[in-house]
């Protein structure tokens, strides 16, 4: 036995001993040379921000419980860990701390690795990597050059947020009220060249593949379906005339509502559209608007909520049915990067167009009337008062004011207009997707260099594979007003691999979603020359993936896309990266603050607050420990730096031990729901572990337990043994099928309570107690592995890896009851209970029920019509 003082539960001593044993035996390093079925359990890798938070602890504890359970059920389990190490926070921290992003990142990795190890996770650390290391990102550089050659990576202009003071591109979240988060300067929209991956080529496959992901939450699949956004419609051509009547390039618009085309009264185009730029050349007022619209962010959400603005360009579009001219407007809600950068405006039946038309006095025409109006309001149509039915194609309607198309419903109008436009070469049926190609360029330093060389003669040339990786210099002076590699001619200047002439490297770096889109595959093939080798097909797909639902769209979409790229590169055989997905809920905690005179709030950490509660545990007041004065209770919210309501996991581990923290994080809520951090609850888990420790020590102090002989057990011994095996069955189901760890713990607690009441020092009493305690130790092992490691030894076993012990199996014979308690009902109402032998004949059960004293009172003077017996549960006597 490792050196542990057995009589006192000292978490630090117990946990240190267990971790030393696991390290010495390399307990959780695995390979493919196993005859056991494989199981790959993966929690989303962390960003090395500096310290773990409770969200990390919950995420990785869930994964660890599943991993340890699966190993105990006979699986070859892989649970790896790495670091999503590139990204903007490192640049921000470098500015703040006057250091290089690399130094800050590696320091954080070292600290967080120590924190993770202190929690005792069953991780194969031999597979660890950081995505900022060249031996990792070389593989995505190689993949990118191959995608370039296949035409799946391409370069085009795209609009970005530009900070004119810091001379840098800003992410959408760095634009606050239209200004740069650091400089405060008004942000401009600027069009610059960007690299893209053709994820849209995989749109239909990504959509269809969701139907095969039975182990993914429906909510995630629904979000992905909506994000992919498959829609069937028509692409319609509008010819365009210049201010002087000259013919310009036609506009093409995609619409899912061609039935409303007769309601088009103008066409809207993006401020960056070539026709807008053309019209602005001789229109100073329009040019000023275009310049103004360059200010502010470029996110779709921002454009959706801002005030609608626009201006007539003077250009005219020719209506494809009537031949009438309609004005072409620039509008701030049309994005050049979405579709064609132009939309047909139907203000009678599109709310956004309706706002613009009413604001600027543009015509509004009704072309749809309901067949089934449900109210007087729905029988009328008012251009100035929007009603939802105006745009609801699910309602039964017919076309009006639509010439030869009057009276048609949606499908009839769709088919008639499609046939007309295709016959006249004015349009065609199209399947469109909301999904856009993945822009992977970032005008930042701390990221993977994009492996492209620019040559005046040869253009954009992929870096030859033998010259990879293109290594990012780490020892740089970083001020935050530009990328060090852009200003470093020694790094930037190179020779063209095709013609040998002078050339320059691409100074953009990859979006960090690139690194996190394929990391799961690299874990399977450490040291492989390519991204993945044959070991990938042994481990993949991931059997259980764990992470927050906030990643449902971006990460989990790119994760699935990159897997298909790996498949098409013949590196993996599977179509999807993960069979099952568990999205854990947030960790929330109380917030406390003091208001300031200017209306702002000083948020106070819960550790600095003394809380008063009533007998039901509800907060009745709170004071600041430092001065004893009241603070305001702000309610429970997600743990965050902004609300200063985070709880330091390291402090909790130091105070209570890792097993207690793990136990509380699994007990407080089901994995998918929010977990409210409550230190009183943590203290309760600590008391539970101390009780378990004391029970095992007390039992062991009486010496080795005799062998169990089930044939001679008395009723109380059978009852405890039955409870033990009922618990084994429930906990195994909760772990394996339901991932309901809180109810598994509750079941073990019930067994502990039964054990505490079991006062039997006989040989078979001690044998039954030994079986129960061994079961508890093994059942809790996935959650409290350190305590279980020592307690297993206290129960008379040698030091061993409990994950290699078989998970307990319920003995069906132990579940059989000698006697049953049945409820007695009279006309369906409970009137009493009876005790019967488990094998009692029906006649005996009926007689005992009829004789039950309280039930008999309700049958006086009445005739028994029927007796219904639900075996093992109820006897219902029907009287009249």
UniProtKB/Swiss-Prot annotation:
Q: What is its EC number?
A: 6.1.1.4
Q: Gene name, please?
A: leuS
Q: Quote the protein name from its UniProt record.
A: Leucine--tRNA ligase
- Write down the chemical reaction(s) this protein catalyses: tRNA(Leu) + L-leucine + ATP = L-leucyl-tRNA(Leu) + AMP + diphosphate
Among PANTHER family, the record links this protein to: LEUCINE--TRNA LIGASE, MITOCHONDRIAL, LEUCYL-TRNA SYNTHETASE
Similarity field: Belongs to the class-I aminoacyl-tRNA synthetase family.
Q: What is its main location?
A: cytoplasm
> What subcellular locations does the record give?
Cytoplasm
Intervals of motif 'KMSKS' region: 638-642
* GO MF annotation terms: aminoacyl-tRNA deacylase activity; ATP binding; leucine-tRNA ligase activity
InterPro entries, alphabetized:
aa-tRNA-synth_I_CS (IPR001412), aa-tRNA-synth_Ia (IPR002300), Leu-tRNA-ligase (IPR002302), Leu_tRNA-synth_edit (IPR025709), M/V/L/I-tRNA-synth_anticd-bd (IPR013155), Methionyl/Leucyl_tRNA_Synth (IPR015413), Rossmann-like_a/b/a_fold (IPR014729), tRNAsynth_Ia_anticodon-bd (IPR009080)
């Amino acid at each position: 036995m490792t050196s542990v003082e057995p009589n006192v539960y000292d978490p630090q001593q117990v946990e240190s001993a267990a971790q030393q044993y696991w390290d010495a035996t390399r307990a959780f390093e695995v390979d493919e040379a196993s005859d056991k079925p494989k199981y790959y359990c993966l929690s989303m890798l962390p960003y090395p921000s500096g310290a773990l938070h409770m969200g990390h602890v919950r995420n990785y504890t869930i994964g660890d419980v599943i991993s340890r359970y699966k190993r105990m059920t006979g699986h070859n389990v892989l649970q790896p860990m790495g670091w999503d190490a590139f990204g903007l926070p490192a640049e921000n921290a470098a500015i703040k701390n006057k250091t290089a992003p690399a130094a800050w990142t590696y320091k954080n990795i070292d600290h967080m690795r120590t924190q993770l190890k202190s929690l005792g996770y069953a991780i194969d650390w031999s597979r660890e990597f950081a995505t900022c290391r060249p031996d990792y990102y070389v593989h995505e550089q190689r993949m990118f050059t191959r995608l370039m050659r296949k035409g799946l990576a391409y370069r085009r202009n795209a609009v970005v947020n530009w900070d004119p003071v810091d001379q840098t591109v800003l992410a959408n979240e760095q634009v606050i009220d239209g200004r740069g988060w650091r400089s405060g300067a008004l942000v401009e929209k600027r069009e610059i060249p960007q690299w893209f991956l053709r994820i849209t080529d995989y749109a239909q496959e990504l959509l269809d593949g969701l139907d095969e992901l039975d182990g993914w939450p429906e909510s995630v699949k629904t979000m992905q379906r909506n994000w992919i956004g498959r829609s069937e419609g028509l692409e319609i051509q509008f010819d365009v005339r210049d201010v002087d009547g000259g013919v310009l390039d036609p506009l093409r618009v995609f619409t899912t509502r061609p039935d409303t085309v007769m309601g088009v009264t103008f066409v809207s185009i993006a401020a960056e559209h070539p026709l807008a730029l053309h019209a602005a050349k001789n229109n100073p007022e329009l040019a000023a608007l275009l310049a103004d619209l360059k200010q502010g962010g470029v996110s779709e959400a921002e454009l959706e909520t801002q005030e609608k603005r626009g201006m007539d360009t003077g250009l005219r579009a020719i209506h494809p049915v009537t031949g009438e001219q309609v004005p072409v407007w620039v509008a701030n809600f049309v994005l050049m990067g979405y579709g064609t950068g132009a939309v047909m405006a139907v203000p009678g039946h599109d709310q956004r167009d309706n706002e613009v038309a009413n604001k600027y006095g543009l015509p509004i025409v009704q072309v749809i009337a309901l067949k089934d109006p449900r109210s007087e309001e729905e029988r009328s149509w008012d251009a100035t008062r929007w009603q939802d039915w105006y745009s609801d194609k699910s309602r039964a309607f017919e076309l009006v004011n639509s010439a030869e198309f009057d009276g048609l419903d949606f499908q009839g109008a769709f088919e008639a207009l499609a046939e007309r436009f295709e016959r006249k070469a004015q349009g065609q049926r199209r399947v469109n997707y909301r999904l856009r190609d993945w822009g992977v360029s970032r005008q930042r330093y701390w990221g993977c260099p994009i492996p492209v060389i620019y040559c005046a003669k040869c253009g954009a040339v992929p870096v030859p594979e033998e010259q990879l990786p293109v290594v990012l210099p780490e020892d740089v002076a970083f001020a935050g007003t530009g990328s060090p590699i852009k200003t470093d001619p020694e790094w930037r200047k190179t020779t063209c691999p095709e013609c040998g002439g002078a050339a320059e490297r691409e100074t953009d770096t990859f979006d960090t979603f690139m690194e996190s889109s394929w990391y799961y595959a690299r874990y399977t093939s450490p040291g492989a020359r390519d991204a993945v080798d044959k070991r990938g097909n042994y481990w993949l797909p991931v059997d259980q993936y764990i992470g927050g639902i906030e990643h449902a769209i971006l990460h989990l979409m790119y994760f699935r896309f990159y897997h298909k790229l790996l498949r098409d590169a013949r590196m993996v055989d599977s179509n999807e990266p993960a069979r099952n997905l568990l999205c854990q809920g947030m960790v929330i905690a109380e917030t406390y603050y003091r208001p300031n005179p200017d209306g702002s709030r000083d948020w106070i950490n819960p550790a600095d607050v003394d809380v008063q509660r009533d007998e039901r545990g509800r907060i009745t007041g709170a004071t600041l420990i430092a001065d004893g004065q009241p603070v305001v209770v702000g309610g429970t919210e997600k743990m965050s730096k902004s609300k200063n309501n985070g709880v330091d996991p390291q402090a909790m581990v130091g105070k209570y031990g890792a097993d207690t923290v793990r136990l509380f994080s699994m007990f407080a809520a089901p994995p998918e729901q929010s977990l409210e951090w409550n230190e009183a609850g943590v203290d309760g888990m600590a008391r539970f572990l101390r009780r378990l420790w004391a029970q095992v020590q007390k039992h062991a102090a009486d010496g080795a337990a005799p062998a169990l002989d089930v044939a001679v057990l008395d009723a109380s011994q059978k009852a405890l043994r039955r409870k033990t095996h009922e618990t084994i069955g429930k906990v195994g189901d909760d772990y394996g099928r339901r991932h309901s760890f809180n109810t598994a713990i509750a079941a073990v607690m019930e067994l502990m309570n039964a054990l505490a009441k079991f006062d039997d020092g006989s040989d078979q009493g001690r044998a039954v107690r030994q079986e129960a305690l061994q079961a508890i130790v093994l059942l809790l092992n996935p959650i409290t592995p350190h305590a279980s490691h020592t307690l297993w030894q206290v129960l008379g076993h040698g030091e061993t890896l409990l994950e290699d012990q078989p998970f307990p199996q319920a003995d069906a014979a132990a579940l059989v009851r000698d006697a049953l308690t049945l409820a007695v009902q009279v006309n369906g109402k409970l009137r009493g209970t009876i005790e019967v032998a488990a094998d009692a004949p029906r006649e005996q059960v009926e007689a005992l029920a009829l004789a039950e004293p309280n039930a008999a009172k309700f049958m006086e003077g009445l005739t028994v019509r029927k007796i219904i017996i639900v075996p093992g549960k109820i006897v219902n006597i029907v009287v009249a």
